[in-house]
Amino acid sequence: MRILFLIAFMYGCVHSYVNAVETKCPNLAIVTSSGEFHCSGCVERMPGFSYMYWLANDMKSDEDTKFIEHLGGGIKEDETVRTTDGGITTLRKVLHVTDTNKFAHYRFTCVLITLDGVSKKNIWLK
């Protein structure tokens, strides 16, 4: 009987946690300014397991999508900044594009990975 109770108790605890829905956090947002892309997204549960990064894909070639640090000069990303307010953690990461000619035909993707899944948002220079 104890085992049955323990199984029922654990199912109730885990089931409600697994099926929780993030409702207070909006989707990813990208704000542009001169040569910069500001990406932000938020996490309600266990933000220490969340990660944000930028990817780039040259739309004029058959190359795979690359991490920003593999593109060489003319582009860089800042460290992810985390702020917490009211139990919600917001992650922000800025992408700086200084060589707009080199990256004119690139698609940039901001990626936020949380325990709830992966969110992506794309943006182009032109």
Curated annotation (Swiss-Prot):
Residues 1-16 form the signal peptide. Coiled coil: none annotated. The keyword Translocase does not apply. Keywords: Early protein, Host-virus interaction, Secreted, Signal, Viral immunoevasion. It comes from the Viruses. It is found in: Secreted. Belongs to the orthopoxvirus OPG022 family. This is Interleukin-18-binding protein. The gene is OPG022.
